[in-house]
């Protein structure tokens, strides 16, 4: 299972890098990272700084260059931008903030922050972390990584029941019973998120959650990316990479549980 964890760490970073990469091309924040705050100055500059920081953290994790520190800083960055960016925007600015769908874009960033903390928890301890107040604080957030990730999974599962028609339209035409699979997928996300949060048969439930998202990657997200690679600032490609990061997060949780390491 250690091999699964190591491979999944790399996969998480590839997915996250694939999500932020298009931002440099479009000089705009992706739908999942920062909302359209009115009158925000120097947007291309902030986009560049954020993207470079995320890519640098991903490279450090993949090549094990102060990897735990990089993962902690990555998780802290994503969580801070979610709280002060998307969460605040959705709470005070968004017109339809009483609809769960309004919060859906930002929830991906929350899940990615949780994934970064899961990655940090899967890496060996780093003595340099104890020398920094910020890193010591971020290290205390590691146990909340699975909760952040699973909260998004549960809420996305609920979206399958609230927005059945548009979500069922994502099911490929060659698969019969679109409505059934929409409800099934929503139920599976809710069940997976709850069981992983409660650590019920954690190695099995987290693995099945990751496997389900991986299957969706191949039968839903990749075909959509091929059909419309550049629409809405390459949103289909970004969604495919987010699915890659999400399944990697679930596999890391599963691998750590199987190795009887704290998650």
What kind of feature is each model-predicted range?
Residues 28-41, 163-176:
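Short juxtamembrane and helix-loop transition motifs at transmembrane-helix boundaries
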Residues 1-28, 32, 44-56, 62-162, ...:
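Extended, low-polarity transmembrane helix blocks
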């Amino acid at each position: 299972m250690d091999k699964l964890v190591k491979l999944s760490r790399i996969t998480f970073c590839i997915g996250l890098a694939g999500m932020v990469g298009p931002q440099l091309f479009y000089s705009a924040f992706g739908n999942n990272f920062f909302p359209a705050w009115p009158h925000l100055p120097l947007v291309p500059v902030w986009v560049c700084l954020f993207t470079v920081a995320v890519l640098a953290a991903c490279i450090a994790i993949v090549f094990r260059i102060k990897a735990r520190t990089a993962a902690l800083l990555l998780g802290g960055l994503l969580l801070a931008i979610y709280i002060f960016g998307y969460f605040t925007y959705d709470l005070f600015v968004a017109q339809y903030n009483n609809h769960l769908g309004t919060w859906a874009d930002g929830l991906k960033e929350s899940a990615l922050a949780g994934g970064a903390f899961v990655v940090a928890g899967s890496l060996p301890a780093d003595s340099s972390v104890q020398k920094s107040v910020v890193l010591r604080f971020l290290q205390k957030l590691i146990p909340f990584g699975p909760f952040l990730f699973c909260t998004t999974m549960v809420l996305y599962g609920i979206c399958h029941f609230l927005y059945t028609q548009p979500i069922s339209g994502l099911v490929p035409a060659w698969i019969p019973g679109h409505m059934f699979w929409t409800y099934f997928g929503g139920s599976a996300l809710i069940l997976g998120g709850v069981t992983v949060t409660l650590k019920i048969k954690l190695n099995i439930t987290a693995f099945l959650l990751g496997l389900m998202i991986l299957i969706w990657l191949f039968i839903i997200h990749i075909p959509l990316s091929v059909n419309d690679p550049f629409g809405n600032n390459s949103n289909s490609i970004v969604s495919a990479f987010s699915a890659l990061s999400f399944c990697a997060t679930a596999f890391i949780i599963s691998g750590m549980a199987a190795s009887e390491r704290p998650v």
